[in-house]
A protein has these predicted regions:
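Short, conserved loop/helix-junction motifs that constitute active-site signature segments
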Residues: 125-127
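Class I (Rossmann-like) S-adenosyl-L-methionine-dependent methyltransferase catalytic domain
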Residues: 1-37, 43-95, 111-118, 122, ...
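A conserved beta-strand element that flanks and buttresses the S-adenosyl-L-methionine
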Residues: 103
Length: 215
């Protein structure tokens, strides 16, 4: 299990992953997430410094964000977001009951396979009949870590009785070759959003999934 000390070491410098600079990705993410969180009570898992809380969840009625890093939570709280509150905790240890939507954006791939299974069991048990939103890279493994694959996510959803509502591409994977680089550049054109939805899996870096937990 990754520890608070591990993540505090990442957060020695603000925004270590450049999340606050990913405005194009965030716009794509908000197009997916927005209709599901407007006026809702949201539990945000792995909220980090609150960048996505501010850019994605501003239309939610309330947001409760948890992160394992005290440094990240201090910075998130300092944002002063009117609809959000933040707390330091391992999100595997908090209650999932009482929220309309649970969102795990760019965080679940930090869990080990066993921890991911434990998470989905807990989600299915404590969030029955409600909405779950997941986003992350679907490129498999690279030199840094093991991420998701589209097939792996769908298998996990099926195994834990989550019904897929929709999935949408968020951006292109430039390292997938010349064609992917061209595709990524094309996304900046006026009709780029239409092209984004047509990219094959091998050209996609991050994807967002919306599902409903079984009653």
């Amino acid at each position: 299990m990754r520890s608070a000390a591990d993540f505090d070491s990442y957060y020695k410098s603000p925004d270590p992953w450049g999340i606050g600079r990913a405005s194009r990705r965030d716009k794509a993410l908000k197009r997916v997430v927005g209709p599901y969180i407007a006026g809702k009570d949201v539990l945000e898992l792995g909220c980090g410094e609150g960048h996505l809380t501010a850019s994605i969840f501003d239309d939610a009625r309330s947001v409760k964000g948890f992160d394992i890093s005290p440094i990240a939570i201090t910075r998130a709280t300092a944002l002063g977001l009117p609809n959000a509150s933040f707390q330091t905790s391992d999100f595997l240890n908090v209650s999932y009951a009482g929220y309309d939507v649970i969102a795990a954006l760019e965080c679940l791939y930090y869990l080990s396979p066993d921890e991911q299974e434990a998470f989905f069991r807990k989600l299915a048990s404590e969030h029955a009949g409600k909405t779950f939103i997941l986003s992350g890279p679907i490129i498999g493994s690279n030199e840094y870590r093991t991420y998701f694959t589209d097939g792996g996510i769908r298998e996990s959803f099926a195994r834990h009785r989550l019904s897929m509502i929709e999935s949408r591409n968020l951006n292109a994977y430039r390292k997938a070759g010349f064609a992917a680089t061209v595709a990524a550049a094309s996304l900046r054109l006026p009709l780029g959003n239409n092209l984004l939805g047509m990219l094959p899996d091998k050209f996609v870096y991050q994807r967002c999934y919306v599902a409903r937990c079984s009653d």
